[in-house]
């Protein structure tokens, strides 16, 4: 199920954001992807990590870090880059914090069969570092 979900999500995001989706492959197998672009809240001039997903079997191999670094480099013209993460996804929150993101307050409810909370995180660029 997880692999099918990844492939379906990858297809969705690569079609919705074709110029802004990077895909990680292991041979002919999609093992992860990241989609990014302008922040979807048009009142804020910023970048956004729209989706990041890596198959569980590939955790700890640096794939998410490589995808994130590439997306952040592409979005470096923005002073802030936002993302939304499931509040209960401690592993993802820890990863994003390691990549320089911090929780900045706003939460929203996402309907995934049942309501789940998402937290907004932000990474502010610091050209001096």
Where is each model-derived feature located?
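C-terminal "cap" of GNAT-fold acetyltransferases
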Residues: 46, 80-93, 97-99, 105-129
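Flexible, glycine- and charge-enriched loops at secondary-structure boundaries
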Residues: 3, 61, 114
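Short glycine-aromatic motifs
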Residues: 19, 100-101
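Short coil/turn segments at alpha/beta junctions that flank glycine-rich nucleotide-binding fingerprints
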Residues: 61, 77-79
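Conserved glycine-rich acetyl-CoA-binding loop
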Residues: 51-69, 86-94, 98-99
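Acetyl-CoA-dependent GNAT
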Residues: 1-57, 68-74, 126
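Short, contiguous strand/loop micro-motifs
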Residues: 72, 79-80
